[in-house]
UniProtKB/Swiss-Prot annotation:
<comment type="subunit">
    <text>Homodimer.</text>
</comment>
<dbReference type="InterPro" id="IPR000653">
    <property type="entry name" value="DegT/StrS_aminotransferase"/>
</dbReference>
<comment type="pathway">
    <text>Bacterial outer membrane biogenesis; LPS O-antigen biosynthesis.</text>
</comment>
<dbReference type="InterPro" id="IPR015422">
    <property type="entry name" value="PyrdxlP-dep_Trfase_small"/>
</dbReference>
<dbReference type="InterPro" id="IPR015421">
    <property type="entry name" value="PyrdxlP-dep_Trfase_major"/>
</dbReference>
<feature type="modified residue" description="N6-(pyridoxal phosphate)lysine">
    <location>
        <position position="186"/>
    </location>
</feature>
<comment type="function">
    <text>Catalyzes the synthesis of GDP-perosamine from GDP-4-keto-6-deoxy-D-mannose and L-glutamate. Can use only L-glutamate as amino donor. In vitro, can also use GDP-4-keto-3,6-dideoxymannose to produce GDP-3-deoxyperosamine. Involved in the formation of S-LPS, which is required for attachment of the protein S-layer to the outer membrane surface.</text>
</comment>
<keyword id="KW-0448">Lipopolysaccharide biosynthesis</keyword>
<protein>
    <recommendedName>
        <fullName>GDP-perosamine synthase</fullName>
        <ecNumber>2.6.1.102</ecNumber>
    </recommendedName>
</protein>
<keyword id="KW-0663">Pyridoxal phosphate</keyword>
<dbReference type="Pfam" id="PF01041">
    <property type="entry name" value="DegT_DnrJ_EryC1"/>
</dbReference>
<dbReference type="InterPro" id="IPR015424">
    <property type="entry name" value="PyrdxlP-dep_Trfase"/>
</dbReference>
<comment type="similarity">
    <text>Belongs to the DegT/DnrJ/EryC1 family.</text>
</comment>
<keyword id="KW-0808">Transferase</keyword>
<dbReference type="GO" id="GO:0009243">
    <property type="term" value="P:O antigen biosynthetic process"/>
</dbReference>
<dbReference type="GO" id="GO:0030170">
    <property type="term" value="F:pyridoxal phosphate binding"/>
</dbReference>
<dbReference type="GO" id="GO:0102933">
    <property type="term" value="F:GDP-4-dehydro-6-deoxy-D-mannose-4-aminotransferase activity"/>
</dbReference>
Length: 371
């Protein structure tokens, strides 16, 4: 084990107004799901994404579920989802009684392969869920074109992509709606929390109604529909607003970290493949994701263990949905790239608090364990 301080794979940066805003919630006793910070956070986030509406939720998974329900996704429907994603993307579809249909990914960006969408569409297909994996927006033009041609809804899973851009537009502004996560390891955090963005007035109103148990906003304790308790607390929103105030600083700090990786990984030669950045926009690098080169005697999982012994935390790329028990029945022969990325993909420490010396340690450790 290393005697040096441990380098975490992710860490929140809480050096703005977070403490002052949380104390205001406590001093005013507005600690639950009503308060000024919820209103201000929603408005500020909508403005940041360039959309009309932002609906705060208690986490990113409930944001996905709420959006799908509001869009009318239900039993018998199909939603196309990448196999290589965090399981919440597929689970949210399953919660609705609908069926996730899995699409393979691009080997360079890790995002879904838009060229493979058309073959998966059936009369039951109702929506496409492009997941902006690890901070880079999917190639949205062909996805939106397929959706228009087949009259399908598009919900962006932008959990990992706050601040990312595609052809001059921010994540959250490209589909019919989009969802975000503010878990503690995300680009901005509320501890736990989520957000939905949309330009659709009716959809926003329905999501707000469903979020608060379905209570009529003009008639207290009258419930015209069955809803959910997916509300964010004022304390969560207070942290989120403080985080959003400094998001540009957070992203700039991440870009410095990425620059160090890009420069220093040359030392490792073909033992790793660096992430591909598309020319269509800004990659915000929620995670700096590499693939291990061919011909190594070690494995990705062994590399993670060896790095851990040297005081450096890393993470595997997400396991594809179709190799895990809940979704193994959805496996097809056309998900091979997702499988390969799931075997050799590795997420290195990526957060705004890292120093150049930290990255030097990571590179030196990789040089030692990649054999």
């Amino acid at each position: 084990m290393s005697d040096l301080p441990r380098i975490s794979v992710a860490a929140p940066r809480l050096d703005g107004n977070e403490r002052d805003y949380v104390l205001e919630c406590m001093d005013t006793t507005w600690i639950s799901s009503v308060g000024r910070f919820i209103v201000e956070f929603e408005k500020a986030f909508a403005d940041y994404c360039g959309v009309k509406h932002a609906i705060a939720c208690n986490n990113g998974t409930t944001a996905l579920h709420l959006a799908l329900v509001a869009m009318g996704i239900g039993p018998g429907d199909e939603v196309i989802v990448p196999s290589l994603t965090y399981i919440a993307s597929a689970n949210s579809v399953t919660y609705c009684g609908a069926t996730p249909v899995l699409v393979d990914n691009d080997p360079r960006t890790f995002n879904l392969d838009a060229a493979k969408l058309e073959a998966l569409i059936t009369p039951r297909t109702k929506a496409i869920m492009p997941v902006h994996l690890y901070g880079q927006i999917c190639d949205m033009d062909p996805i939106l074109e397929v959706a228009r041609r087949h009259n399908l809804l598009v919900i962006e899973d932008a959990a990992e992509a706050v601040g990312a851009t595609y052809r001059g537009k921010k994540s959250g502004s490209l589909g019919d709606c989009a969802t975000f996560s503010f878990f503690g390891n995300k680009i901005i955090t509320t501890g736990e929390g989520g957000m939905i963005t949309t330009n659709d007035d009716d959809l926003a109103a329905k999501m707000r109604l469903l979020r608060g148990q379905g209570m009529d906003p003009n008639r207290r304790y009258w419930f015209p529909i069955v809803g959910f308790n997916y509300r964010m607390t004022n304390i969560q929103a207070a942290i989120g607003l403080a985080q959003l105030e400094r998001v540009d600083e957070h992203l700039a700090a991440r870009e410095r970290v990425v620059g160090w990786y890009e420069q220093k990984l040359a030392r490792l030669g073909n033992r790793v493949t660096k992430p591909h950045v598309a020319l269509t926009g800004r990659h915000v690098f929620w995670m700096y994701t590499v693939r291990l080169g061919e011909g190594l005697s070690t494995t990705r999982d062994q590399v993670i263990k060896d790095l851990d012994a040297l005081g450096i935390e890393s993470r595997p790329v997400f396991h594809p949905m179709h190799i895990m028990p809940p979704y193994a029945h959805l496996a097809t022969d056309d998900l091979k790239i997702a499988e390969a990325c799931g075997v050799d993909g590795l997420n290195l420490p990526t957060h705004a608090g890292l120093t150049e010396a930290d990255i030097d340690r990571v590179i030196a450790a990789l040089d030692q364990v990649l054999v």
